[in-house]
């Protein structure tokens, strides 16, 4: 006797996520400038515009850099507000187009944007600064190995004709596959400085943020 063949009903494709709608909803209620959410099977971040910043302190720092003849210390304004959001979205998209590891921008509007987490869902992505600090008990070779990885990650950006915003070790993150990624782009040094000075600024930021560990 021929028995009927019972098959499981076909599962249709998962509905596409409306990132723009999710962003619009969260910006209406989110209290913090940046917050993380689970959205389907991925983790995302919503970054909203903060209070605009004044220019007074940047003018003072600029005058000091000019007085001492140190153009590499010329301040790069972070104006906050919607301008900082637009700057970060533009910079993330530009660096991604250059093949560099940065968070993917999923949706954006004037007062905020949505980006994908640089790592596995529900897992923190450690910064290189955290890794270097944790390596101190293991000795100078372990610290130097991580420090050189950060330096090479910055060099990779420079070789692509770009620069970072604040190249502190805390803004270099270790992705699950071992690649060093880059975060925090609320300002654009290339808008106010020649590229060679931007590269020098990156080197100074990285050296400043890691000097305490190299001394040990």
What are the language-model segments listed below?
Residues 95, 150-157:
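Conserved hydrophobic alpha-helix
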Residues 158-169:
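Catalytic-loop of the protein kinase fold
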Residues 175, 185-216:
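C-lobe/activation-segment region of protein kinase-like
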Residues 168-175, 181:
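Conserved protein-kinase catalytic-loop segment immediately C-terminal to the catalytic Asp
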Residues 32-84:
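ATP-binding glycine-rich loop module of kinase domains
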Residues 57, 65-68, 78-96, 100-146:
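Conserved structural core of kinase catalytic domains
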Residues 51, 120, 180, 187-191:
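Activation segment
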Residues 1-33:
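Juxta-kinase regulatory segment immediately upstream of eukaryotic protein kinase catalytic domains
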């Amino acid at each position: 006797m021929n028995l009927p063949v019972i098959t499981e009903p076909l599962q249709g494709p998962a509905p596409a996520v409306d990132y723009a709608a999710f962003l619009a909803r969260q910006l209406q209620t989110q209290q913090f400038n940046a917050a993380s959410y689970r959205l389907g099977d991925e983790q995302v971040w919503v970054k909203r515009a903060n209070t605009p910043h004044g220019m007074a302190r940047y003018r003072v720092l600029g005058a000091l850099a000019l007085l001492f003849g140190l153009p590499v210390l010329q301040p790069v304004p972070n104006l906050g507000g919607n301008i900082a959001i637009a700057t970060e979205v533009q910079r993330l998209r530009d660096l991604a187009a250059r093949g560099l590891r940065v968070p993917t921008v999923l949706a954006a509007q004037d007062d905020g944007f949505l980006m994908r987490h640089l790592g596995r869902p529900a897992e923190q992505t450690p910064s290189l600064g955290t890794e270097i600090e944790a390596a101190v008990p293991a000795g100078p070779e372990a610290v130097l190995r991580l420090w050189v990885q950060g330096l090479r990650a910055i060099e990779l950006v420079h070789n692509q004709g770009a620069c970072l915003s604040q190249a502190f070790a805390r803004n270099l993150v270790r992705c699950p596959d071992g690649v060093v990624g880059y975060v925090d782009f609320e300002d654009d040094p290339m808008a106010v400085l020649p590229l060679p000075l931007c590269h020098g600024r990156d080197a100074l930021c990285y050296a400043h943020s890691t000097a305490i560990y190299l001394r040990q």
